């Protein structure tokens, strides 16, 4: 079952950075790199979601996967399609499977602080919150008040704020496509 899945050994510390990455951008890379350095992780796995259950639609998977590969630099950053390979749509399913597939590996879930607003909408969010340590990396527009509802045992990493967002990138792309071409 581990064939074509990322390599990890007992004792390793792996950050799990899941997302739609629609598209991936420098802000995503900043979150992953901050967690890698500040948490002393051996690797960060970018888990490209087949389809975010909280979003109506996403760009094609291959396009999003490639955009993540273009942002994840260095040998310690691993972009993977393991959720698609395993057929999972929800984080709790992924965490259950990874704990069985990789005994002795210490996983930490990484997310930008902007994801806190929707965390309680995740399927089995309580299970996710208790399954592994969760590291929250600061993001623009998310102040300390947003963190108040999050469990105290989570790890909060304040870092330089990176203003780019996938939503803004998609909006600019749509606007550029909608502009009439001059002859």
Where are the language model's segments positioned?
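Nucleotidyltransferase catalytic core that binds NTPs
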Residues: 1-183
């Amino acid at each position: 079952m581990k064939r074509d899945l990322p390599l990890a050994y007992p004792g390793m510390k792996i950050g799990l950075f899941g997302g739609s990455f629609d598209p991936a951008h420098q802000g995503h890379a900043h979150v992953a790199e901050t967690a890698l350095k500040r948490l002393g992780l051996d690797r960060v796995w970018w888990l490209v979601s087949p389809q975010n259950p909280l979003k109506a639609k996403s760009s094609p998977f291959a396009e999003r996967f490639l955009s993540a590969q273009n942002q994840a630099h260095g040998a310690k950053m691993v972009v993977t399609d393991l959720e698609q390979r395993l057929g999972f749509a929800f984080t709790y399913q992924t965490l259950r499977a990874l704990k069985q597939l990789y005994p002795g590996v210490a996983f930490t879930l990484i997310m930008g602080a902007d994801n806190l607003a929707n965390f309680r909408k995740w399927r089995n969010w309580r299970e996710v919150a208790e399954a592994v340590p969760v590291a929250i990396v600061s993001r623009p527009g998310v102040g300390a008040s947003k963190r108040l509802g999050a469990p105290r045992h989570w790890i909060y990493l304040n870092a330089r704020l990176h203003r780019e967002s996938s939503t803004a990138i998609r909006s600019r792309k749509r606007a550029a496509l909608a502009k009439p071409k001059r002859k």
